[in-house]
């Protein structure tokens, strides 16, 4: 029996609301386990990788790096049609992220003799994590590697878990080729994050690690961020749908099921101003859950789901901003009214014909997004995650002279006389010996 929360939003208890808002907060529960694995990888390198790959993936590997022969075999196995679809998705992702690219270097004249600017520089190396396990995720390879390449990152590697026979799914390898990854390693879980953060005999250390994963992977990313920068916490998938009476119940239900099939911990919520729609969606969800291919996972996941009835669109929007969803679908007649008031969302999908899966695969927007409420403080993966910025100042003597008194006054007020003297030195001052 599927137990899904179905209530008027105003009747949701404080405990129920807290469960919805603070979803996915299991990092502390696995922290010690993750820390131990990371420590082993840091100290033992490849030996630890072999140990944990055998323990968790149930496979012994002679080599972690995918060979050129394995890439060629993968490309021959998937066929030209599927490869063509990968290339379509890749080109859309590439085009969208190219549009995000800032001007590499720009300048402005603040005042005569004072020219300020900014220079964007790509990171030197990035490691992309692509989950495995229940399914292969070649789309994640595209979403992580392509923006890094567009940004101009010099070295991009991928880590993804091996299958039981020690291979990587051919579609994942094909995606790595299409996206332009330099190397792919058969490594998953915490040990993969540790390898990319610390470096081993085989796996190069990277400047930044990006990509989603389970609670163990997310915890590992959080723990290594003093060594390698990360994108953001990206855990079990989630969707929030804001709908009114104009929405299609079957479509909304199918989007709830689509999220639920990701993971038993996935979260799907509908908040609507229409009680009729709420009832129809609930019935559709229960029916579709029985017939969908991954029914067992879906039914477990739906225990985290909710159908909520709001008094107004304003109440829907207020709930959404508190929930801060990874994916937000807006299925209302006046979508602009809602969009203008949304503050916190990883990626937004507007209309009955913009379901989350189109963004997951091929529209071009990025599907690596903050979850568990982190959309309040993080943006989804974008070109800026692969760039760093240096400010520039070009100042002439006359320009410095116009700022001289201000700088000297502020420096001396802070008790930093040498700062003030460095300004005076440009105008003939020499400190006494």
UniProtKB/Swiss-Prot annotation:
GO terms for biological process: L-histidine biosynthetic process. GO terms for cellular component: cytoplasm. It comes from the Archaea. Pfam families: Histidinol_dh. SUPFAM superfamilies: ALDH-like (SSF53720). The active site is at residues 326-327. Keywords: Amino-acid biosynthesis, Histidine biosynthesis, Metal-binding, NAD, Oxidoreductase, Zinc. It catalyses: L-histidinol + 2 NAD(+) + H2O = L-histidine + 2 NADH + 3 H(+). Binds 1 zinc ion per subunit. Zn(2+) binds at residues 259, 262, 360, 419. It is an enzyme of class 1 (oxidoreductase). Its cofactor is Zn(2+). The keyword Metal-binding applies. CDD domains: Histidinol_dh. Its EC number is 1.1.1.23. GO terms for molecular function: histidinol dehydrogenase activity; NAD binding; zinc ion binding. Substrate binds at residues 237, 259, 262, 327, 360, 414, 419. NAD(+) binds at residues 129, 191, 214. Pathway: Amino-acid biosynthesis; L-histidine biosynthesis; L-histidine from 5-phospho-alpha-D-ribose 1-diphosphate: step 9/9. Catalyzes the sequential NAD-dependent oxidations of L-histidinol to L-histidinaldehyde and then to L-histidine. Belongs to the histidinol dehydrogenase family. This is Histidinol dehydrogenase.
């Amino acid at each position: 029996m599927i137990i899904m929360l179905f209530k008027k939003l105003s009747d949701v208890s404080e405990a129920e609301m807290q469960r919805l808002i603070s979803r996915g907060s299991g990092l502390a529960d696995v922290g010690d386990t993750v820390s131990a694995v990371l420590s082993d990888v840091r100290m033992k390198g490849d030996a630890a990788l072999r140990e944990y790959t055998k323990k968790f993936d149930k496979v012994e590997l002679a080599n972690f790096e995918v060979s050129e022969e394995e890439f060629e075999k993968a490309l021959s196995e998937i066929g030209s049609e599927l490869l063509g679809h990968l290339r379509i998705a890749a080109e859309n992702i590439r085009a969208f992220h190219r549009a995000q690219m800032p001007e590499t270097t720009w300048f402005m004249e603040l005042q005569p003799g004072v020219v300020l600017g900014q220079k964007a520089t790509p990171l030197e190396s990035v490691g992309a994590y692509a989950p495995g396990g229940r399914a292969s995720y070649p789309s994640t390879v595209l979403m992580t590697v392509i923006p890094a390449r567009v940004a101009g990152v010099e070295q991009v590697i991928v880590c993804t878990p091996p299958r039981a026979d020690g291979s990587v799914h051919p579609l994942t390898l094909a995606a790595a080729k299409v996206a332009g990854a330099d190397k792919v390693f058969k490594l998953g879980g915490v040990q993969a994050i540790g390898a990319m953060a610390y470096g081993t005999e085989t796996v190069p250390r990277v400047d930044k690690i990006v990509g989603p994963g389970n609670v163990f992977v997310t915890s590992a990313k959080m723990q290594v961020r003093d060594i390698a920068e990360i994108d953001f916490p990206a855990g079990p998938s989630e969707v929030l749908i804001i709908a009114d009476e104009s929405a299609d119940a079957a479509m909304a239900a199918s989007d709830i099921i689509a999220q639920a099939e990701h993971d038993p911990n996935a979260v799907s919520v509908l908040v609507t101003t229409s009680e009729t729609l709420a009832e129809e969606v609930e019935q559709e969800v229960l029916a579709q859950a029985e017939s969908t291919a991954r029914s067992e996972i879906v039914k477990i996941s739906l225990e985290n789901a909710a159908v909520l009835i709001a008094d107004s669109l304003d109440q829907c929007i207020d709930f959404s901003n508190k929930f801060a969803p990874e994916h937000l679908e807006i299925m209302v007649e006046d979508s602009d009214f809602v969009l203008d008031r949304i503050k916190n969302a990883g990626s937004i999908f507007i209309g009955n014909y913009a379901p989350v899966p189109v963004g997951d695969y091929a529209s071009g927007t990025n599907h690596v997004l903050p979850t568990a409420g982190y959309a309040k403080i993080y943006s989804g993966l974008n070109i800026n995650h692969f760039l760093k910025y240096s400010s520039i100042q070009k100042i002439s003597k006359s320009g410095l002279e116009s700022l001289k008194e201000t700088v000297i006054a502020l420096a001396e007020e802070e008790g930093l006389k040498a700062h003030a003297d460095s300004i005076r030195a440009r105008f003939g001052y020499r400190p006494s010996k």
